[in-house]
Amino acid sequence: MILANVFCLFFFLDETLRSLASPSSLQGPELHGWRPPVDCVRANELCAAESNCSSRYRTLRQCLAGRDRNTMLANKECQAALEVLQESPLYDCRCKRGMKKELQCLQIYWSIHLGLTEGEEFYEASPYEPVTSRLSDIFRLASIFSGTGADPVVSAKSNHCLDAAKACNLNDNCKKLRSSYISICNREISPTERCNRRKCHKALRQFFDRVPSEYTYRMLFCSCQDQACAERRRQTILPSCSYEDKEKPNCLDLRGVCRTDHLCRSRLADFHANCRASYQTVTSCPADNYQACLGSYAGMIGFDMTPNYVDSSPTGIVVSPWCSCRGSGNMEEECEKFLRDFTENPCLRNAIQAFGNGTDVNVSPKGPLFQATQAPRAEKTPSLPDDLSDSTSLGTSVITTCTSVQEQGLKANNSKELSMCFTELTTNIIPGSNKVIKPNSGPSRARPSAALTVLSVLMLKLAL
């Protein structure tokens, strides 16, 4: 009898371990957050080919057309449509910045997501795919194309913003698109209208979307030690046409105008997602990714929310959209919070300084890493010093050092004020979801050891 019980337990143990370790346990419609995102244009095509999805999508768009969320929630047909779409690729779809059908993709995304939140959100989720590249990738390309590696003493005295413009002129595509936006933004329309801002913005968008970042970043985020260099950096986007105006509008009003346009709304949401200051990272950036923040910042240039350097000071980095919080009334606190995300943003400041310094940081968190963009914002977060030297800007020595260290699984930060070496990031975030996966916590192997322990105890008791 005891032997029979033991045999049954062994059989049960084998089946239990097989089911727990089986990859099929990770699959199923209930885990739609794990599904890799499809671009919204393709997702729309897939939905249109399926009658159930297509009809439900039309129903949901009709439900959201009235913009009355409470009415939609009370309507069973609207809720049924939403439940069906939540299990389709359309619900999790994302877009790529600069893609061929970007506007169409974003229109599809917002047609679903605009009405699903109650009221106006301060921070909106980004419709763009997450950035996986790092600044170190840009450094390597920039050093190859620009031929950097000069004597540090000579480099310290050079105007890096001027060098960046010269490097752009050596590339046909960069030179062509830069000449185009300079010509358009400098073209006076009349004595009372200095330029056609709409055309200027379009030309700037084409430049920053179509020219590789190893050129655009060097022009936009070049490090400076004197006022002449800093002024050239400020003039990069031709601010007299693209940025400044006779009067500064209220920042919340400007945000409202931006959010009426799908492209502008998406770029602003992407900036908040990638540059919003975080308590939970060393660099104050979400996932310690400087590249994602700088890319999101550059992505806003050429829209109503275009940001720029507020002055030509070489010792401090302060950027802002052309707006103020005058006339905010009882919304002044919200307005100031919105403006501080630009003017007092440690993530953005650190990212700009890191690029000018030729450094990047990867860190291993001491504790669990949560989604950085959901953390409460730090009002005052210590940032890197402002007076970083130009001598290390995009230098070959910096890249060589980082490369040699990377071979050992480390990355170095070689700024004069801060010398750190961090191990590679060991916590992974699954693309297309907000979930964080710890290295040793895979779902398929989470419970077999516990089951084995329990069953061993039961076997021992029965044997006794």
Curated annotation (Swiss-Prot):
Recorded GO molecular functions are:
glial cell-derived neurotrophic factor receptor activity; heparan sulfate binding
Any single Pfam family the record assigns to this protein: GDNF
Glycan-bearing residues: N52, N357, N413
Keyword tags: Cell membrane, Disulfide bond, Glycoprotein, GPI-anchor, Lipoprotein, Membrane, Receptor, Signal
Compartments reported by the entry: Cell membrane
Q: Which InterPro entries match?
A: GDNF/GAS1, GDNF_alpha, GDNF_rcpt, GDNF_rcpt_a2, Glial_neurotroph_fac_rcpt_a1/2
Q: Which domain of life is it from?
A: Eukaryota
Q: Could you name the Gene Ontology cellular component terms for this entry?
A: external side of plasma membrane; receptor complex
Q: What is its main location?
A: membrane
Q: How does this polypeptide assemble, per the annotation? A: Interacts with NRTN ligand and RET: forms a 2:2:2 ternary complex composed of NRTN ligand, GFRA2 and RET receptor. Also forms a 4:4:4 tetrameric complex composed of 4 copies of NRTN ligand, GFRA2 and RET receptor, which prevents endocytosis of RET. Interacts with SORL1.
What family does the database annotate? Belongs to the GDNFR family.
Q: What is this protein called?
A: GDNF family receptor alpha-2
Tell me the organism's taxonomic lineage.
Answer: Eukaryota, Metazoa, Chordata, Craniata, Vertebrata
